[in-house]
């Protein structure tokens, strides 16, 4: 499921560098991106959540491959690829 969602979403991005995907259980994060190492890690627990949450985390982390910080440009890119990200982000704080 992770790979199919990732493949569907990454085509929305231009100039996305090649990167490695890692899935593992994390206790405090839904995802993490190491831009320098070109590695995206997703929390394996996302498999139990609605796909909108998985999609948001993927978009968020892929956006970090382009913008390392949470700048205005970063959030614009997230919104471009996940229109309702603000609501999804709010809902995820309840988990």
Indicate where each model-derived feature is located.
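Active-site-proximal or metal-binding-adjacent scaffold patches in catalytic folds
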Residues: 1-56, 65-95
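Walker B catalytic acidic pair
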Residues: 61
């Amino acid at each position: 499921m992770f790979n199919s969602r990732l493949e569907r979403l990454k085509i929305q991005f231009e100039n996305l560098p090649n990167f490695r995907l890692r899935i593992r259980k994390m206790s405090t994060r839904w995802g993490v991106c190491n831009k320098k190492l070109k590695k995206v890690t997703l929390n394996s627990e996302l498999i139990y959540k609605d796909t909108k949450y998985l999609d948001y985390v993927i978009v968020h982390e892929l956006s970090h491959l382009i913008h390392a910080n949470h700048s205005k440009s970063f959030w614009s890119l997230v919104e471009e690829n996940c229109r309702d990200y603000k609501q999804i982000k709010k809902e995820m704080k309840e988990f």
